[in-house]
Amino acid sequence: MPRASAAQTTSQARRRTGPAPCRLASPSVTDVAPLATLLDLRPLGDDAFTAPTHGPDAGVERVYGGHVAAQALLAATRTVPADRSAHSVHLAFVRSGRPGLPVRLDVTRDRDGRSFATRRVTVRQEDAVIMEMMASFHVEEPGDDWTATPILDVPGPEETPGRSFLHELPTLGVFDWRVTGETVPGEMDATYPHWVRTVEALPDDPAVHRAVVCGMTDIAAVRGTMRPGFERGEGGFTGASLDHAVWFHRPARADEWMLFTMDSMSNHAARGFGIGRAWSADGRHIASWAQESLIRHHGGAE
């Protein structure tokens, strides 16, 4: 088990202990929207919704895909019966989103069965598709409960400082993100463990937490698919998520510490592939995911 304290009774109590989260500067702090604002979906009718993005002066050139993934999963969840929760999500990142423009989320009800429901979500900005999502929802049923892989034995979040290179992505300041377990400081390991939670406390709605966890899995996904031994100082690169799949195994609170790992599996033809896992601080296997990323080192083809 990691050297982390067990989950406390409430996320509010957790916020009052330990070091302050790694808060990120940006060219215009007011343009970095709080997470609650990003998750404020407004219905347009006929299973369509709109949601905001960060402002145009938030210090980034494109919308963080994890935020859009969380919005899309929330939109899909609003169209299914309350007794069903998402167990798998498949995402295709079609093109980069632009900060300052709202997104439109159109949900298609592909199936409503006795135990499962399937939804497709198309996310657009100004009529251009930026993401496609397929999500499956399942009624909770009794069954076996076990996990093959235990949580890693790494320093706990209170012993791990936030990573300063996130200043490159100020919109991720809504998350408190701490990399741990590096064998060589500043160098990528094949397994890339990091603690993460939201900076702000979230409502008790399990659908909100599941959507935020979905978005969190994209935080380090590009770096987690890079070749082991890559040093951040050895040269520039362009990275982007291409497609992403998440499987939810157990419920969790996104505003309490979770340990994420990314195992880099393969790099070829400017693409990287990795597999991720998430555990709660008390060792429950929460979710798994897989990602293919674009990793284009500077000097390559445009």
Q: How should each PLM-predicted stretch be described?
A:
Residues 22-302:
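Terminal targeting signals and extreme-terminal segments of soluble enzymes
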Residues 2-11:
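Short alpha-helix boundary/capping segments
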